[in-house]
């Protein structure tokens, strides 16, 4: 039966973040992806507003596409590649939170989780990729970064590149009943959320330690990109601030809430650590004025500008980037410790 555009937009508006419109169009992989990410954090759901007509047209000519499936290679998509990277890291982070207690987790559990996240995005729409090669790339990469939470980044990169290299159109399959499709989606959803919910509810402190370690590794990678680092910190702290704004201090038990406050403090402390490192780069002490910072910046830039150090170009470029990054950090006004509590209670 032909799919209607009006019905698709209605389902998109009513249950878009849960993937109802994709379920209606027979895009089960896309529906599962939206279920597990709440519509790609909301951004993917909003962006789809302009894509729904093409999704409906694709669903209505699905039979013709099946007949021509397997012929040729789908065009390379930068958006799909980036989405594979992000979802792969997201699956890896969830695995770190919920399954890191397992033996050989970094050899089996982590690459499997990241690889499945990459494959889920690869299977969106009328495309798919090779399961063995994609998971193989993930498993081969994981031992190189064994025991490090940051391993989810190179594993996701390797799996995404492999998935793009082996991309192809989906083969022809027979139609399935809605109950079978819902059963499969339900099992996949429970497999993803079950361990996570158990870990969060029963092992809060341990869960937070893994989250903190992982966030620390990620944020440290952006120490030379202050603007991007601050954006990531704001995104990470947004759920906490929203929860505080909605329920205050009485939404959950104080002992439980204190555990999550520790995570907030952990992420928030990166501003102080980055400022101390920036002061070391400038050779200044705490309490330096803006005039002193600006003057020292001009001196260091003049000394280490690559054009003035042609015989040690590599060292000059490295120091020049350090100086620029440190200056961006020191330019930002510093909030006193604990000011975030006052900001939230002032509401």
From Swiss-Prot:
Subcellular location: Membrane
Record flagged with keyword Calcium: no
TM stretches of this protein: 5-25, 32-52, 81-101, 105-125, 135-155, 186-206, 218-238
Keyword Lipid metabolism: no
Ranges of residues in domain J: 277-347
Top-level taxonomic group: Eukaryota
Matching InterPro entries: DnaJ_domain, J_dom_sf, TM2
Membrane topology: Multi-pass membrane protein
Gene Ontology cellular-component annotations: membrane
Family annotation (PROSITE patterns): DNAJ_2
Function according to Swiss-Prot or TrEMBL: May function as a co-chaperone.
Name assigned to this protein: DnaJ homolog subfamily C member 22
